[in-house]
Amino acid sequence: MKASDLNKSTVDELRSTEAELTKELFNLKFQLHTGRLEDTSKPARIKKDIARVKSVLRAKRG
């Protein structure tokens, strides 16, 4: 997910994307702690995507 792609999105789309990523991160953390997650770097990538979305949202708000 690139910030340039996020800049083209509306605020509502960004909020829904943030919610989806947060849910996905929760599920990945659960899988990680139960030992079912094979790609252990995925939670870190999702965290970075959430940070990108929040940065773009903050920039669009003001």
Curated annotation (Swiss-Prot):
It comes from the Bacteria. GO terms for cellular component: ribonucleoprotein complex; ribosome. One of its GO terms (molecular function) is structural constituent of ribosome. It holds the Pfam family Ribosomal_L29. Keywords: Ribonucleoprotein, Ribosomal protein. CDD domains: Ribosomal_L29_HIP. GO terms for biological process: translation. Disulfide bonds: none annotated. Belongs to the universal ribosomal protein uL29 family. This is Large ribosomal subunit protein uL29. It comes from Geotalea daltonii (strain DSM 22248 / JCM 15807 / FRC-32) (Geobacter daltonii). The gene is rpmC.
